[in-house]
Amino acid sequence: MPDDPTLTRRGFLTGLVAAVFAAAHGVEAASCPPTEDNPQGPFYVSGAPFRVGIAPDDEPGERLVVTGRVLSATDCRPLPGAVVDVWHASDAGAYYGMEGAGGDDAWRLRGRASTGPTGAYRFETILPGRYPLGPRRLRPRHIHYLVTHPAHRPLVTQLYFAGDPFLEGDGLVRRSLIVPLASPPAAGGAPKRLAATFDVVLSPLKQ
């Protein structure tokens, strides 16, 4: 039985109207899901300085550069003016600024960055150490994040590194928060540094 041209035309117009409505209201086929949250933990200290290098030259551990962008979940656009606040454990598994951690600089391995037009941020640090959770367990290497933006909901989360044998069985780890560790060749005699990229997607205050 041939298709009814009236019904075919009606279906086409219905689809066209839906497409126009979606475009007008910012609805896109491609999704940009918000970054999953993760506990803040007890070691956060507010007021960290704005700086790229959060590990002094004398800080023990493998050198690491972490870069990424802060994006909006609405349309995946970069968010200038976001503040990325990070902190993590030393190579020995201690958090500076906490009792018993040692060191004379409470802001070691802590810092903030403000994103520019591309939403980009960068930190130069060391690969975080692990620390014990009981006699037989270690927390995998991780970096804590607190990301804020005036028009978006604050996000508290953690970044984890692929290949860490202690990821398995850690109840806090989420697959989406695990990123690969790269080891790019050092140029011009510069010291070798590991590299990781972690983009953060924030939910808008109003949807």
Q: What role is predicted for each listed range?
A:
Residues 22-26:
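Hydrophobic membrane-targeting signal helices
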Residues 1-20:
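N-terminal secretory signal peptides and thylakoid transit peptides that target proteins
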Residues 27-184, 191-207:
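Beta-strand-dominated extracellular/periplasmic modules and repeats
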